From Swiss-Prot:
Belongs to the complex I 75 kDa subunit family. This is NADH-ubiquinone oxidoreductase 75 kDa subunit, mitochondrial. Residues 1-23 form a transit peptide. The lineage of its organism: Eukaryota, Metazoa, Chordata, Craniata, Vertebrata. The modification N6-acetyllysine is found at K84, K467, K499, K709.
């Protein structure tokens, strides 16, 4: 059953059109009429019986079919009767023909489904009371709806040995119904061939053949698509039932993609994180870091204000004392003697509040941890630092050139889009930078940034590929811009993009230039006028420094004067907190309603799922309280008022789920002429080369035991983190 779909995936042929609606043939211009239980519906030729039924709102039961995966047709649960046909047909795989009358609830259809369900349940264990899939199990629901009320099976049930495929996905393979969704997901979406089947008939098993870790940054998604309890979450095992939890729609901040998520909580604790559908960003997938790093929200948290005593030790204190100390110091300095550094997990509301606070003392010394060139157009033009084509726009591109980036681990969901387009749309991919293990074939052009200048001048062989491109896309990794020649690299890419526009038939509305960011706060910070990088602080060390969630280690105590007063405000005791003279505990992304802007410039909101631990408070509220004690009260008291202020400074920050048009590429190219354009020959090396570098990149994931287990499993093998099962 699997050979044809997997073969298609491996050779890059498509058995589905672009997007997520799939047909099995070429769509003609004329619609054809079919009938579903006597109801007329017009569909395109090649539409399957199942799709035609869904068009009129008729749900057909299925286990193996998934709208984003190839058709396997091996569970047979979707059998329906076609009027005047001798036998029932598999609705997921059979294309409709003109005039067909599909009978979804005939006696023949019901009997067929009942028979299939009986065979599925024959070997399925009665684990429902102890199965983590209970309450959201397709087999439970469909056996109730379409199965028989009694069993005729009296023999012994078969049992299958469980597989250890790592610290994230728990396997109880006796429950497996061989739908092969996990195999097709791994091969087609994740781009790894770790999963497969062995044996046949009653002896068929799904697994890795040789016991090893399921090595993918998207592996947790097999938990969602598994229709039974064969694949479940190891960290979530035996902790809660779905009906006990409260679901809060939010967004992820582990990278700059802004994946939509659902945070499940119980009694003030995050129990698990699931994906939420958003066609333009993450479809219905999320990365493993997004899904499993939530246990880091419970560890190494800052729960009370702290001050450094005479002995140099940090001790707990009250909010009044901590804020009074900070306010007293703030009143002693003004101008650029006061500075601030914003970290990667900071929300836009806190960024604008801190900006207003420092502006009140005549300081504009506001920096981000991430470096971005400010020469030429720099950050003055928004199109200069965004993924202008958008994430979904990758599906329209015909050529993608990756420069100094590894999207597989920097932005896994963006990488999944590239693979989807490569698989289905014959996308050509090339890479300039260190060779990395991507999930699709690519042409490695070399690792020197000088290749950019060769392409711009027309001397490189890749120019022939670009000449034929109608919708080329250049993706420049933000880490490539953090080198000493970052500005020259940005100019080289900008010049190359303009040359592509001149020499090819690229439409004026198509955006070629794209920057792929790695951290969630960077775009909002640049929108609000923060200076990228901390070089200005190193050159002119301040007397007072605010570290707002700054845990990247971009500045150390040795870079600052001994008498510099440091205030750390954040939610984890990570890199920044030990440097501080005063610590102000803030709220994590699951504990506040906050605005984040993703790499394509799309503003989105997190929602309050749980309350902050201990005495921790939302960041903008802490800054507002500090301003009042310091006698420079900020002009807002509520979240709505803060967002009104956001709109004054940068209106796009409150246009939620909307992308503003960016078209200032010609102006950026002209300003680039003012920049030193000499690039170094040093190779472009992305910071996240392997999957080991993917798991622990911020204060939350570094505090996560699950992420630490993943790193150990990758380096030492899945057996190194194997835990005894109680089930």
């Amino acid at each position: 059953m699997l050979r044809i779909p997997i073969k298609r995936a491996l050779i890059g042929l498509s058995n589905s059109p672009k997007g997520y609606v799939r047909t099995t043939g070429t769509a003609a211009s004329n619609l054809i009429e079919v009938f579903v239980d006597g109801q007329s519906v017009m569909v395109e030729p090649g539409t399957t019986v199942l799709q035609a039924c869904e068009k009129v709102g008729m749900q057909i039961p299925r286990f193996c079919y998934h709208e984003r995966l190839s058709v396997a047709g091996n569970c047979r649960m979707c059998l329906v009767e076609i009027e005047k046909a001798p036998k029932v047909v598999a609705a997921c795989a059979m294309p409709v023909m003109k005039g067909w009358n599909i009978l979804t609830n005939s006696e023949k259809s019901k009997k067929a489904r009942e028979g299939v369900m009986e065979f599925l349940l024959a070997n399925h264990p009665l684990d429902c009371p102890i199965c983590d899939q209970g309450g959201e199990c397709d087999l439970q629901d469909q056996s109730m709806m379409f199965g028989s009320d009694r069993s005729r099976f009296l023999e012994g049930k078969r049992a299958v040995e469980d597989k250890n495929i790592g610290p994230l996905v728990k396997t109880i393979m006796t429950r497996c119904i061989q739908c092969t969704r996990c195999i097709r997901f791994a091969s087609e979406i994740a781009g790894v061939d770790d999963l497969g089947t062995t044996g046949r008939g009653n002896d068929m098993q799904v697994g890795t053949y040789i016991e090893k870790m399921f090595m993918s940054e998207l592996s947790g998604n097999v938990i969602d698509i598994c229709p039974v309890g064969a694949l479940t979450s190891k960290p979530y095992a035996f902790t809660a039932r779905p009906w006990e939890t409260r679901k809060t729609e939010s967004i992820d901040v582990m990278d700059a993609v802004g994946s939509n998520i659902v945070v499940s909580t119980r009694t003030g604790e995050v129990m698990r994180i699931l994906p939420r559908m958003h066609e333009d960003i993450n479809e219905e997938w999320i990365s493993d870091k997004t899904r499993f790093a939530y246990d880091g929200l419970k560890r190494q948290r800052l729960t009370e204000p702290m001050v450094r005593n005479e002995k140099g030790l940090l001790t707990y204190t009250s909010w009044e004392d901590a804020l009074s100390r900070v306010a007293g110091m703030l009143q002693n300095f003004e101008g650029n003697a006061v500075a601030a550094i914003a970290g990667g997990l900071v929300d836009a509301e806190a960024l604008v509040a801190l900006k207003d606070l420092l502006n009140k003392v005549d300081s504009d010394n506001l920096c981000t941890e991430e470096i971005f060139p400010t020469e030429g157009a720099g950050t003055d033009l928004r199109s200069n630092y965004l993924l202008n084509t958008t994430i979904a726009g990758v599906e329209e591109a015909d050529v993608v050139l990756l420069v100094g980036t590894n999207p597989r681990f920097e932005a896994p969901l963006f990488n999944a889009r590239i693979r989807k387009s490569w698989l289905h749309n014959d996308l050509k991919v090339a890479l300039i930078g260190s060779p990395v293990d991507l999930t699709y074939r690519y042409d490695h052009l070399g690792d020197s940034p000088k290749i950019l200048q060769d392409i711009a001048s027309g001397r490189h062989s890749f120019c022939e590929v670009l000449k034929d491109a109608k919708k080329p896309m250049v993706v420049l990794g933000s880490s490539a811009l953090q080198r000493d020649d970052g500005a020259a690299i940005l100019v080289a890419v900008s010049n190359m993009v303009q040359k592509i526009r001149v020499t090819t038939g690229v439409a004026a509305e198509w955006k070629v230039m794209n920057i792929l960011h790695r951290i969630a706060s960077q775009v909002a910070a640049l929108d609000l006028g923060y200076k990228p990088g901390v070089e200005a602080i190193r050159k002119n060390p301040p007397k007072m420094l605010f570290l707002l969630g700054a845990d990247g280690g971009c500045i150390t105590r040795q870079d600052l004067p001994k008498d510099c007063f440091i205030v750390y405000q954040g939610h984890h005791g990570d890199v920044g907190a030990p440097m501080a003279d005063v610590i102000l505990p803030g709220a994590a992304y699951t504990e506040k309603s906050a605005t984040y802007v993703n790499t394509e410039g799309r503003a989105q909101q997190t929602k309050v799922a749980v309350t902050p631990p201990g005495l921790a408070r939302e960041d903008w509220k802490i800054i507002r309280a500090l301003s009042e004690i310091a006698g420079i009260t900020l002009p807002y008291d509520t979240l709505d008022q803060v967002r009104n202020r956001l709109e004054e400074v940068s209106p796009n920050l409150v246009r939620y789920d909307d992308i503003e048009e960016t078209n200032y590429f010609q102006q950026a190219s002209e300003l680039a002429k003012l920049v030193n354009q000499e690039v170094l020959a040093d190779p472009l090396v992305p910071p996240q080369l392997t999957i080991k570098d993917f798991y622990m990149t911020d204060s939350i994931s570094r505090a996560s035991q699950t992420m630490a287990k993943c790193v150990k499993a990758v380096t030492e093998g899945a057996q190194a983190v194997e835990e005894p099962s109680i089930c």
